[in-house]
Amino acid sequence: MSFRFNKGAFEDNSFNEQIREALTSALNSKTQSSSQTAPANTTNSAATDEVKQETRGPKRLDILKSGISVSKVNFPSTPQLEILDLDVSAQSRSLLKGICKVSCKNAMLEINTEIEANLLLLYTNDGPSFTTPRLISNDSFTVPITMTFNQIELEAITNIFVKNNSVGISFNDVNLDFDFDCSIKLLQSSIEKRLKGSMETVFKEVLPSVIFSMSQRWFTHGESTCNSASDDKSAGRQVENHSHTPRTILEDCDLEDLSPANMLRLSTLVSSRQSLSLNPTAMNTLSTIPGCLERQNLHRFNSRIPALSNFYPDFYEVESPHLKAFGRSVSTNVISSGKLEHHNALPQRVLDERSYDLKTIASVQSRIFERSSGDGTAIRRRKIKMGKKSKSKKAQSQDIENSSPTVVMPSSPSLEPSAVSTPEALHSPQPTTAVQSPELLAENSESVSIPALILPTQADHYTLPVKTSAPKLNLLEEAHYLNRKREFQKLRTSLYSPIRSNRFNLNKEMERPILEHKGLNFVGLTHGLNWGSEDLPPPYRG
């Protein structure tokens, strides 16, 4: 079953005017209610206003400077209504329930209003006077705005309730599409997003109230409606006035059942919000707000930082008198000279009296390392063994004798140099025989004593001198030393010369100097060869 609307009613401008007035009153219903309650609020006391402001949530700023007015409404095509279901038997005769499908196309709507562009003015008007600054120029700046909705297409499934003199409607499934245009292009995208998000409230509250108010004009006429409307307004005003009258939540007898500690904390919080003071309500705590540090408790925080100076606060003699009056101690970093020392340092008095403890120092250092690293790495300490007895000189000499090999020095025959009478004899060669006669050997054997064979156990022990490690030379000193060694190496000595065995014990040819045939320049060449490879150059030497 379906119905058709009368086309003459939509062709006439009266229907559009009725829709325009109904939409204007519905959109301005909230602003009118707030303006009516404003004079009632001024009569209340200041205490009740503060309690209400504290109990309410955060207040939203209203940027509307004036009311919302619907300037144009146009329905070029007749809306269509299709009844999907109708229930009459189960209900009384005065109630009609049905499910309908409503469709509307090519509708147009234009809305005008004014907004406040100076948001700082809104914040200062709503905020308390003792927290708002005094601005030199804080005037109002009103901007008019016009919003136009074109090509509105609506398809919805609705539940309709008809009872005596009114029609109630609720929207279930809604498909809405429109073209939006705003006079301020900068705000068009943001307003369009907000409108699409607020369409749910439009179809739940605005349109049902508009249809309900228009249905009362369709079904009934006369003074009864005016009287009922006036009665409703008077009843509404009485309810509003009653809602703003102060009410007693707790009586004096009820205060005895409350905890005194809780009441003290509540009163402290209320006073802190009014005076912006941060007096702590708990004892032995750094701050009442977790994660925040108050200025008055900064000395407690500094005293709990792991440092050697915090373990010996009594050894600092200087304290400021103005802090002593409040029962506080000055920071441990301040000394008598007025300069700042390191945070991790012992006082001089502790070092003089030797009143420190190694375990305490180790624990402090480990805590500092754990706080600084934060990655859970193990602490690596340097271990020093104290009280270990050193070996005596006799024990060292015995160890050297046991480790060094034994050497037997054979007795060399005494060689007497032949006397040279004249210089001619020195330069004139004398013939000698390679093989001597047996008689000469016999004579020489009597004069020369052959040493007896000595076993290792019977031989006298000769200890070799301990070789000391030569000092480390740098590149320039090593090159100079090798050049000097080469000059001594060129000497032709005898095979059995003791000079070669003792002073020049060379088994292989010396290495060539490092700096030979290399074009390198060093700063040390002009400074007497006094710095090595591990030291800094002379300009940077400390």
UniProtKB/Swiss-Prot annotation:
Classification via InterPro entries: Mdm34, SMP_LBD
Subcellular location: Mitochondrion outer membrane
Keywords tagged on the record: Lipid transport, Lipid-binding, Membrane, Mitochondrion, Mitochondrion outer membrane, Transmembrane, Transmembrane beta strand, Transport
Species classification: Eukaryota, Fungi, Dikarya, Ascomycota, Saccharomycotina
Residues of the SMP-LTD domain: 1-216
Family: Belongs to the MDM34 family.
Any single Gene Ontology cellular-component annotation: ERMES complex
Swiss-Prot/TrEMBL GO biological process terms: mitochondrial genome maintenance; mitochondrion-endoplasmic reticulum membrane tethering; phospholipid transport
Domain of life: Eukaryota
Subunit record text: Component of the ER-mitochondria encounter structure (ERMES) or MDM complex, composed of MMM1, MDM10, MDM12 and MDM34.
Function: Component of the ERMES/MDM complex, which serves as a molecular tether to connect the endoplasmic reticulum (ER) and mitochondria. Components of this complex are involved in the control of mitochondrial shape and protein biogenesis, and function in nonvesicular lipid trafficking between the ER and mitochondria. MDM34 is required for the interaction of the ER-resident membrane protein MMM1 and the outer mitochondrial membrane-resident beta-barrel protein MDM10.
Domain notes: Lacks alpha-helical transmembrane segments, suggesting that it resides in the membrane via beta-sheet conformations similar to those predicted for other outer membrane proteins and porin. The SMP-LTD domain is a barrel-like domain that can bind various types of glycerophospholipids in its interior and mediate their transfer between two adjacent bilayers.
Regions of compositional bias (Basic and acidic residues) in chain numbering: 49-58
GO molecular function: lipid binding
Topology of the protein relative to the lipid bilayer: Multi-pass membrane protein
Origin species: Lachancea thermotolerans (strain ATCC 56472 / CBS 6340 / NRRL Y-8284) (Yeast)
Region (Disordered): 27-58, 372-435
Key word Disulfide bond present: no
Low complexity bias spans: 31-48, 403-414
Biased composition (Basic residues): 379-394
Presence of the UniProt keyword Membrane in the record: yes
Record's protein name: Mitochondrial distribution and morphology protein 34
